[in-house]
Amino acid sequence: MRAIVLLLGMVLLGGCGSPRERITGCAALGELKPICGFSRPEDMEVLGDARTLLISEMGSSQFGSPGSLALFDTRSETITRLPQFTEPSDEYWGQASCTTPPGTAFSPHGIDLSRRKDGRWQVLAVNHGGRESVEFFQLLEEGEGYRLAWRGCALPLRH
């Protein structure tokens, strides 16, 4: 598991350096095997089962494509993109004035996973799509997997 997380981190950071040989076309290069299928991955968090990663995939305003949050199972190497967040919440953790979910323009950048004082898991995601905000989500276990429930947002102060 640790090796897969390390390898995924190297793949995600692959564009940050200038290696002598690059993996292209999603083909292995020597002992390096890329994990393909992500779209502009930005950040990741290891979830409580120590096998699932939550990964932010930033959209592209240049091409009009939204981003997403995705789950990556490190054992089966499967990617599950979470649905767009269009449903309002029945409970708000962010600013009282933020009651509209990010919708289909959602484009997450950095993410953070933490446990709230009440014991529930919280995911914060910096959003650059549709609005500049920090979106609040509750991480929920569902069967043998996970899902996120939108719980509000924090918006920048207007000057």
Predicted segments, located by residue:
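C-terminal motif of bacterial Sec signal peptides marking the signal peptidase cleavage site
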Residues: 14-15
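A short helix->beta-strand "capping" segment at the edge of beta-propeller domains
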Residues: 18-40, 93, 148
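Beta-strand-rich domains and repeat architectures in extracellular enzymes and scaffolds
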Residues: 33-68
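Surface loop/turn motifs at the tips and blade-to-blade linkers of beta-strand repeat domains
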Residues: 34-37, 83-85, 101-103, 152-158
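Beta-rich catalytic cores
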Residues: 40, 65, 107, 130, ...
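Residue-level detector of Asp-centered blade-edge/turn motifs that repeat once per structural unit
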Residues: 47-49, 115-119
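Blade-loop segments of beta-propeller domains
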Residues: 68-115
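Short loop/turn segments immediately following beta-strands, especially the blade-tip
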Residues: 138-146
